[in-house]
Amino acid sequence: MRIVYLLLPFILLLAQGAAGSSQALGRKSDCFRKNGFCAFLKCPYLTLISGKCSRFHLCCKRIWG
């Protein structure tokens, strides 16, 4: 029974961190507004990461316009 008291704060910290995690990700429309495009896992050559479209999709932007 003593371990429950030790685990409770840890569980509460995990729940608190997971509460706002979905808001941290951007959306496709935000990426397109920044003149970018969504790419799976990594951006192509001569592009930079400018954000996230979803968990596995990055928002990429071309280096030269």
Curated annotation (Swiss-Prot):
Record GO terms (molecular function): CCR6 chemokine receptor binding; chemoattractant activity
Keywords on record: Antibiotic, Antimicrobial, Defensin, Disulfide bond, Fungicide, Secreted, Signal
Residues spanning the signal sequence: 1-19
InterPro entries: Defensin_beta-like (IPR001855)
Function of the molecule: Has bactericidal activity. Potent activity against E.coli ML-35, L.monocytogenes EGD and C.albicans.
Annotated family: Belongs to the beta-defensin family.
Protein name as it appears in the record: Gallinacin-1 alpha
Originating species: Gallus gallus
Classification lineage: Eukaryota, Metazoa, Chordata, Craniata, Vertebrata
